[in-house]
Amino acid sequence: MRSPPGAVAALASVAAQLATAALVPRDAAAPTTAAMPLPFPAQVGIDDSNLATCANANWPPPSSPVGEVISAQLPDADLQAALGEVDPARIRAIVDKLVGFGTRHTLSTQTDPTRGIGAARDWIAEEMRGYAATAGGRMEVTVPGYVQGVASRISFPVKISNVVATLKGDKDPDRVYVVSGHYDSRVTDVMNYEADAPGANDDASGVALAMELARIFATRRPAATIVFTAVAGEEQGLYGSAFMAQTYRNASVNVEGVLNNDIIGSSTGSRGEKDPHTVRVFCQGGSPAGESKERAETRASIGGENDSPARELGRFIAEVGGNAFTDMKVALVYRLDRYLRGGDHRSFLDAGYGSAVRFTEPNEDFNHQHQDVRNATDGTVLGDLAEFVDYDYVARVAKVNLAAAWSLANAPPQVRNVTVDTSTLSNDSGLSWAKIAGAGAALVKGYEVVWRPTTASLWTHQLYVGDVASFRVPLTKDNVIFGVRSVGLNGYKSPATMPFPG
C-alpha cells in the first residue's frame, strides 16, 4: 500500500530534524530557544471492512462439537431412601450428650465416668457398637490409640485415642473412604483442660455427622469400605488424625477419599448473615505430597495446579451433593483451609493421601469458637454452646456427606495412569488410561471423558466412550483441561483424573 503524500512529507521533515540533531556534540550547550515539537506523521489508512468486531468474537466457544453439557449425578431410589433417614433430632441428641461431658480437652481426665475426654470416648465407642450390631458382622468398632509424649500443646504424656467404625465393602473392600470429625474441645487458653469446653459446633457437630452416617450405612452394603471416625487431639495439633493417617500409610491402606467435617454446625455468621443452604468444601491445589519433582514440574507446565486429587474430589462432591435432595449448594474453596486455621484432612494430605477435603459452614461466628463460656460486658453470650447450633443445617451437611460417600463407595475406582498424546502437533487429543483391574473391574461399565475451559472451576462437558482404554477427542488439548472417569454398571461415576503428557 502506498503511503499518503502527507505522510511522506512529514516523515521527510522528521528525518531531516533527526539528522541535524545527530550533528550536535553530546556536550554542546542547550539551545537558547525552546525546541519545536516534532510533527506526527499523518495516520496510515487501514481497510477494516473485513475484520470481525469484538461483538462477533467467539471465545470461549459457546458449545462443543462433541459430547454434551455435563449434568449433576442425582441420587437413585436407594440413595434417596438413605438421605431420608438423616435425623436432625438424633444429631441434636449426640451434640447434647457430648456437651454434657463438660470438657473434652485432650489433656482432661480419662478416668472420670461422666466428665472429660475419656468418658466421651467411651460413650462414642458404645454408640458405634450399637450401630455395628445392625450390620450383620460387616462393621467393626475399634479404639486405637497411643501415648503422646510432651510436645507442642502437650504438657505431659497422654493417651490419644480415636474411635473408628469400619464398614467393610461388599465388592471392593480394599478401597477405603473416611468420614471424620474430632471429639476433643478447647476454650480460649488451649492448655486449659479443667474449664468447661462444650465444643458444640467445634466439633461435636462433625462427630454427630459421622455417627449419624455410621448408623444409616450400617444396614446397607456399599461396594467399597467406609470408615466413620471420631478423632482426638485435633485442637492440640492434629495428633489423632496424624496417628490414624500414618497407621493407614504404614499398612498400605488404599484410602481414596477423606471427608473431614469440622465446624459444620451453624448457618449464621458473626454479622448475623445467614446462609443455611451452603457448605464450604476446602480443597488444596498444587502438587500432592509425595509427587516427584519431575511430575510436579510437568504439572506446573501444563496448568495442572488446579487439578490436584483434592480438587477433583471437591468437584465430585459438588456434582453429587448439591441438589434438591440435599437442599444444599456446595461452595468449593480452592485452598487448604481458612487463614490461621487447620484441620484433620491435612494429616491425610501430609501422609500422601491426596484426596482429602474439609467441610465447614459458610459464615463463622468466632464468639462461639475457642471461647471461655461467659457473658461479655455488652451482654453477648460467648462460648461454643449447643444453643447456637442449627441442627437442621447439620442434617443437610450430613446429606451432602452421605451423597458423596455413597456415590464414591458405589462407583468403580478412580482411573489411573491417564495420559494425553503429545508426540506430534495435532488439533485432536488422544487420551489413554489403564482400565480398572482387580475387584473394582466387576463394577465397570465403561469410561467417560470430561473437559472444561482452562479458566472454568467445574467440568462442563462429558462424553461416554465405552469400555475402552483410549479415545481420540476432536478438541485441541491446548484450550481445555481433560479428565477421564470410570462409569459403573449402576450408573455411578468416579471422580475424574487429569491426564499428563505421555
Curated annotation (Swiss-Prot):
<keyword id="KW-0732">Signal</keyword>
<feature type="binding site">
    <location>
        <position position="202"/>
    </location>
    <ligand>
        <name>Zn(2+) 2</name>
    </ligand>
</feature>
<dbReference type="GO" id="GO:0008235">
    <property type="term" value="F:metalloexopeptidase activity"/>
</dbReference>
<feature type="region of interest" description="Disordered">
    <location>
        <begin position="284"/>
        <end position="307"/>
    </location>
</feature>
<feature type="domain" description="Fibronectin type-III">
    <location>
        <begin position="414"/>
        <end position="502"/>
    </location>
</feature>
<feature type="binding site">
    <location>
        <position position="262"/>
    </location>
    <ligand>
        <name>Zn(2+) 1</name>
    </ligand>
</feature>
<feature type="glycosylation site" description="N-linked (GlcNAc...) asparagine">
    <location>
        <position position="375"/>
    </location>
</feature>
<keyword id="KW-0482">Metalloprotease</keyword>
<dbReference type="GO" id="GO:0005576">
    <property type="term" value="C:extracellular region"/>
</dbReference>
<comment type="similarity">
    <text>Belongs to the peptidase M28 family. M28B subfamily.</text>
</comment>
<dbReference type="GO" id="GO:0046872">
    <property type="term" value="F:metal ion binding"/>
</dbReference>
<keyword id="KW-0378">Hydrolase</keyword>
<protein>
    <recommendedName>
        <fullName>Probable zinc metalloprotease MGG_02107</fullName>
        <ecNumber>3.4.-.-</ecNumber>
    </recommendedName>
</protein>
<feature type="binding site">
    <location>
        <position position="202"/>
    </location>
    <ligand>
        <name>Zn(2+) 1</name>
    </ligand>
</feature>
<dbReference type="Pfam" id="PF04389">
    <property type="entry name" value="Peptidase_M28"/>
</dbReference>
<dbReference type="GO" id="GO:0006508">
    <property type="term" value="P:proteolysis"/>
</dbReference>
<feature type="glycosylation site" description="N-linked (GlcNAc...) asparagine">
    <location>
        <position position="427"/>
    </location>
</feature>
<keyword id="KW-0325">Glycoprotein</keyword>
<keyword id="KW-0645">Protease</keyword>
<feature type="binding site">
    <location>
        <position position="235"/>
    </location>
    <ligand>
        <name>Zn(2+) 2</name>
    </ligand>
</feature>
<dbReference type="InterPro" id="IPR007484">
    <property type="entry name" value="Peptidase_M28"/>
</dbReference>
<feature type="glycosylation site" description="N-linked (GlcNAc...) asparagine">
    <location>
        <position position="417"/>
    </location>
</feature>
<dbReference type="InterPro" id="IPR003961">
    <property type="entry name" value="FN3_dom"/>
</dbReference>
<feature type="glycosylation site" description="N-linked (GlcNAc...) asparagine">
    <location>
        <position position="250"/>
    </location>
</feature>
<keyword id="KW-0862">Zinc</keyword>
<keyword id="KW-0964">Secreted</keyword>
<dbReference type="InterPro" id="IPR045175">
    <property type="entry name" value="M28_fam"/>
</dbReference>
<feature type="binding site">
    <location>
        <position position="182"/>
    </location>
    <ligand>
        <name>Zn(2+) 1</name>
    </ligand>
</feature>
<feature type="signal peptide">
    <location>
        <begin position="1"/>
        <end position="21"/>
    </location>
</feature>
<keyword id="KW-0479">Metal-binding</keyword>
